[in-house]
């Protein structure tokens, strides 16, 4: 996609609806509908729809919502459909991109001709992938915090952000506080939570068991594990103390608390892409196959998420990987991720291939995020050298869970569930054949920081040559 930011992926279930952002077109003016994260609509009457830029529409949305200047960097306009998501650059013309949508679908998705013909994007006002988390912590405007909160909540509830149960309960408790008000002892909170459980917890955590025991449990008033944890988290939500007891000010602190908790997730604020990876060979016939994954890319790194199991398969900072993409004729495009690992105690380089028609977009986004990170390093160094500054709202460090609990966390890598190509520099393969690689492959890495990816030298003559 020429000039695009390159953010594409599969939207969550809440976004899987066909809706147009152009409600009526006249000779000169048109009503453009811009959707917010909570599915509310901002109607805009614009002149010269075919030539208006994303920057101009972005400014119009900010004026209608009366957002401060920070919203210019915190949010971006997106074209979103059930098949593809694209973050727009300020210079892009949304109407023209909308007209080109079928071409983009054919280029970057595996959608059928019928699906392409039926698909229609909507214009959405969402978080900018390139907005740093540290800047987000400095925001105090109530409406900006609310919009960020609504988007993060949607990603948690649709499991685009995989979370451990205890984290989901904490986040769900904050949602309860926002939607139901302060917890009041004695109120029928358990019944209310049970009726709206999917409004507070991801759907896969709301499924009840089946069978005889589930039937008996349903007759009583006892809550399930998720419900009880959610209720406890709701009780423990801290209220803001002070003279200002206005509801908006109180909610602002809970929006911020929700976002701070989400900042613990390594893939918060990512762009999402669709792909597939090879499964490890299993069984007598060593059959593998593929599994669908979501590739999440942010300013910090890359995460590969199992769509079915809702957990991370691989998480890498940019300092820990090298990458490339290939698009050979008559073959599937592939994003290659190369990183350090070991094979039965032997240090090796591991190579993961992600099959995706969006490989080109992912590779471009990785390269751009690295450029932004390198450009930001001098600025951060100058800020550190200028002396300590008082933070406007310092947050307490997150409490670390016991080590054994963390090992099973959904955000921990599960490399054993991936089929990788293991090798050393001179091409000696470990159990698999080293594929042909482009000459620029090792050069595409962030090697200026400590702990960077390194090429493993062959040290053991017993390595199997495939």
From Swiss-Prot:
Annotated knockout phenotype: Mutant mice are viable and fertile.
Single GO biological process annotation from the record: protein localization to plasma membrane
Tissue-specificity statement: Widely expressed (at protein level).
A Gene Ontology term for the protein's cellular component: nucleus
Annotated region described as Disordered, given as residue ranges: 1-21, 379-409, 442-466
Composition-biased stretches (Polar residues): 442-460
Subcellular location per the Swiss-Prot or TrEMBL entry: Cytoplasm, Cytosol; Cell membrane
SMART domains according to UniProt: B41
Main location: cytoplasm
Modification Phosphoserine, positions: 24, 384, 409, 440, 447
Keywords in alphabetical order: Acetylation, Cell membrane, Cytoplasm, Membrane, Phosphoprotein
Function: Promotes the cell surface stability of iRhom1/RHBDF1 and iRhom2/RHBDF2 and prevents their degradation via the endolysosomal pathway. By acting on iRhoms, involved in ADAM17-mediated shedding of TNF, amphiregulin/AREG, HBEGF and TGFA from the cell surface. Negatively regulates Wnt signaling, possibly by antagonizing the recruitment of AXIN1 to LRP6.
Complex formation: Interacts with iRhom proteins, including iRhom2/RHBDF2 (via cytoplasmic N-termini); this interaction leads to mutual protein stabilization. Interacts with LRP6; this interaction affects LRP6-binding to AXIN1.
Protein's UniProt name: FERM domain-containing protein 8
Lineage summary: Eukaryota, Metazoa, Chordata, Craniata, Vertebrata
Gene: Frmd8
